[in-house]
Amino acid sequence: MKKFLSLVLALTMMMSLVTINAGAKEFTDDEELNYKEAVDVISEISVVDGYEDGSFKPQNTLTRGAAAKIICNLILGPTTAAELHADTAPYKDVPVSNTFSGYIAYCAKEGIISGYADGSFRPAGTLTGYAF
């Protein structure tokens, strides 16, 4: 619970420093965004960057691996988070070649996230709002 509250506090502090300008990323599916201002804020500070095709896809589910990346971007900032890497596989189903392995390894080391009893993490598994 302490780590979660620390994460919320860090996010609150970061967002209080942000001003949105005309340079906020425009997603190809902006008209589908119910919370466009919030999406503008988190994309402006590079917490999320959308998909390669330029869309945000608000209807898609969030995977456990992508959640680890978002958490690292919030805590470390996107530049430092992008430099994270895993020297060894953090979980039996997360090889070092996995896109999210560095983020998952960092979050696991810091006690922010955990895997399953069988030693897996299931990075492609989806999260509910409650779990995140």
Annotate the PLM regions.
Residues 2-36, 49-102, 110-130:
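Feature responds to low-complexity, polar/acidic, surface-exposed segments characteristic
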Residues 40-47:
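Mature N-terminal segment immediately following signal peptide/propeptide cleavage
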